[in-house]
Design a protein with these regions (language model features):
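Solvent-exposed soluble domains appended to multi-pass membrane proteins
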Residues: 1-229
Length: 229
């Protein structure tokens, strides 16, 4: 099942997601959000959706796969942004000396933090956090923080880079399970296309690696020079 708290037809996701095998729900197609304003609330989406598949797993033992596409952190990050406004007090208290755009960005993205907090609480309450894997990544750096006058991304990241630096376009992939005994950091260069083969191997799934462009980032024979760019 897949969820997106924006218009379900945007970018034709109502066509692509079913072709990927998902039962897809978005605004206008079965996802009924209660918090008004743009961008919409990730916490609201999680509260409306997670209890059903968690309860089903507890009752039947049937594994679930839920795909979420977040929208709460979407630009722009003035106080007119619904999520920035919703979490303004917390962001300003945490970063009182930050510029307004940076405060607004943090405030908007706190909504995803709250959504994940809620999800983990529900998984732990159901006793299945140790049997759950969460895979999370982003699509791009917050380029809307860059204006003609000020590069607020430098303030946010603490790096004196520019849009011409490759380092700005590096991303992070978070893979978590409640059963992890300790954290693992992988510094091997990799790309989004490496996620599927890596997770497939961790789950012990059989697949033809010739049909996947990526590599398992934990593989001992991983050649970083072949990483996708």
């Amino acid at each position: 099942v897949a969820y997106h708290n924006n218009s379900y037809t945007y970018y034709n996701r109502h066509l692509t997601h079913p072709n990927l095998g998902y039962d897809y729900y978005g605004q206008g197609n079965g996802l009924n959000l209660t918090v008004p304003g743009w961008p919409y609330s990730d916490l609201d989406m999680m509260e409306q959706t997670a209890p059903a598949y968690i309860e089903d797993y507890v009752n039947t033992g049937k594994p679930f796969h839920a795909y979420y596409m977040s929208v709460s952190g979407h630009a722009n990050w003035g106080w007119g942004n619904a999520m920035s406004a919703k979490n303004r007090e917390a962001a300003v208290a945490a970063y009182p000396n930050a510029s307004q755009p940076v405060q607004g960005y943090i405030a908007a993205n706190l909504e995803l933090e709250y959504a994940l907090t809620y999800l983990l609480e529900q998984l732990e309450a159901a006793g299945i956090a140790d049997d759950t894997v969460i895979c999370m990544t982003a699509d791009h750096y917050p380029y809307a923080l860059v204006t003609d006058e000020v590069d607020y991304y430098q303030e946010l990241s603490g790096k004196q880079d520019s849009e011409l630096d490759i380092s700005r376009y590096k991303n992070t992939w978070l893979l978590w399970s409640g059963s992890m005994e300790s954290s693992v950091t992988v510094n091997t260069p990799c790309s989004a296309i490496d996620i599927l083969p890596t997770v497939s191997n961790l789950f012990g799934l059989e697949f033809d690696s010739r049909l996947m462009s990526g590599h398992d980032v934990f593989a001992q024979n991983y050649n970083a020079s072949q990483a996708s760019t």
